[in-house]
Amino acid sequence: VALNNGHVVITVKPMKPVLRVFNNDGSYYINRSGKRISADARYYLDVPVACGNFDSTFTPQHLLPLVDYIYTDSVWSSLVSMIKVNTATNIILVPMIRGHVINFGDVENIENKFLRLRHIYRNILPVKGWNYYDTLSVKWAGQIVATKRKKGLAAPVVKIIDESEFEA
């Protein structure tokens, strides 16, 4: 806006990224309206990460309703670390909790799928054990399908140091 005194007033509204995308085009962010924002390797924003197979029929923008749901719920935003897109109907959520992945299916009926997941996390995993299942699936309507782990998880690479070894 130009003022009478010859000055120009510029109003800038920064775009706020809500998702980091890694695909064949490289890495970039998108905001809530789906606009692409360049990513700079010098800076990092703590937003959900999506990677996988995107094309003209299923773009990262199609994930925005899912990202919005995750982003507005403190439990899910703390739990979900990555969204992996195999196909438009085979979306995998990778939780911070090691040991299993979540087959979310497509981006339809998001609230219902998260209600079923909440049931699993509150009622089933505390009883069966956090490493009992390999995959938790809410892909199909009205169902929770859990795939039992065939093998145990690899032991974490942690060496316990006996402090008595260092005594003189």
Residue locations for each model-derived region?
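Amphipathic heptad-repeat alpha-helical coiled-coil "stalk/arm" segments that mediate oligomerization
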Residues: V1-F22, V85, T135-I144, K148
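A short pocket-lining beta-strand/turn micro-motif at the edge of beta-sheets
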Residues: T89, H100, Y132-D134
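A short interface-forming secondary-structure element
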Residues: R98-E108
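Extracytoplasmic/luminal low-complexity segments enriched in Pro/Gly and acidic/polar residues
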Residues: V107-A168
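Short, basic/low-complexity N-terminal boundary segments at the transition from targeting/disordered tails
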Residues: L3-G6, Q61-P65, W76, L115, ...
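Extracytoplasmic segments of membrane-associated envelope/inner-membrane machinery
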Residues: T11-A88, V94, V101-I102
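A sequence-composition feature that detects small, non-aromatic residues
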Residues: A2, A39-A41, A50, A88, ...
